[in-house]
UniProtKB/Swiss-Prot annotation:
Subcellular location as annotated: Cytoplasm
Gene field: hisG
Protein name in UniProt: ATP phosphoribosyltransferase
Activity modulation notes: Feedback inhibited by histidine.
Matching InterPro entries: ATP-PRT_HisG_long, ATP_PRibTrfase_cat, ATP_PRibTrfase_CS, ATP_PRibTrfase_HisG, HisG_C, N-reg_PII-like_a/b, N-reg_PII/ATP_PRibTrfase_C
Pfam families named in the record: HisG, HisG_C
Organism expressing this protein natively: Sodalis glossinidius (strain morsitans)
Enzyme category, top tier: transferase
Amino acid sequence: MLDKSRLRIAMQKSGRLSKESQQLLEQCGIKINLQQQRLLAFAENMPIDIMRVRDDDIPGLVMDDVVDLGIIGENVLEEELLTRRAQGEDPRYFTLRQLDFGGCRLSIALLLDTPWTGPECLRGKRIATSYPHLLKQYLDKLDITFKSCLLNGSVEVAPRAGLADAICDLVSTGATLEANGLREAEVIYRSKACLIQRDGELSVAKQSLVDKLLIRIQGVIQARESKYIMMHAPTERLDDIISLLTGAEQPTILPLAGDQHRVAMHMVSSETLFWETMENLKALGASSILVLPIEKMME
C-alpha cells in the first residue's frame, strides 16, 4: 500500500512513454529501483512512490486523488477528460507543464487507393479508433456525421478486415500505417507527454517536493535543448560571432596566452547547432570549435 505521506507519481509501466518517463525522473536525481514485474517502486533518496500502470489508467488515478502526479500523453488525458464529461462528471486536475518527449499525432488514415479531398469524405463513413471522443469532438466541429467503431488495439487492420472505411489512430513515424497499406490523410490532434497534478491542496512537505521537482525538470529539459560551446575567436569579429548564436547569457571571454588578436569564448547556446552554423563560425575566423552536451542546468 502506498504511504500517503509520500509523494505518489503514476507513470506508464510499458509502452511509448515508459522509458523516457523513467529517464526523466532519474535525471532529476530520483533513485528508483524498478523491477519489471512490480507495479510499485520506491525512491531510495526522496519520499516518492512510483505507481506503474497502463497509460489510460493514469488520468483517472490523478482525477480520483489516488496519486498526486501523473506523467501522461496529452492525447490520453484529453480522451479521458471528454469521456468523463460525456458521463456528466466534472473531472478536476491541473497541468503542471508539458514535457519534451512522447510527441505524436492523432490522425485519420485510409487505404492507399481510397480517394481523399478533405474531412467531408468521412461523412457517413465508419471509422475505427481507440479515441472515440477526440474523433467526435473534431468531426462535430465540422458538422460531419459518422459511425464509430471502437477498437482498443490493432486499429490498423480494420479497413482491410472490412470493419471500417478509415481509422483514427496515433502516428509517430508512419511506419505502422505503411506496413498495413494505409496513408495518413488528416491530423486531428497533436500530443506530447505532460505532467499533471491532482486537484486539492498538497501538504507543505509534498508541495515543497513538487516545486523542487519542477525546477529540476526545467533544468533537465533546458539542458537537452542547449549546448556548451567553446572556440577561439578573433577580437574584431566577436559581435558577428555572438549574433550567430542564441545564448542563455552573455558569453565568457578569456584572453589567450601570447595572442592579442584572439580570445577564448565560452557560452551556452539554446539553439541546435547545425553544421551550417559551425561553418559560418569558421568563415568568421573562429577555430578550435567544440560543441558539448549539457547534462544538467540551473539558471
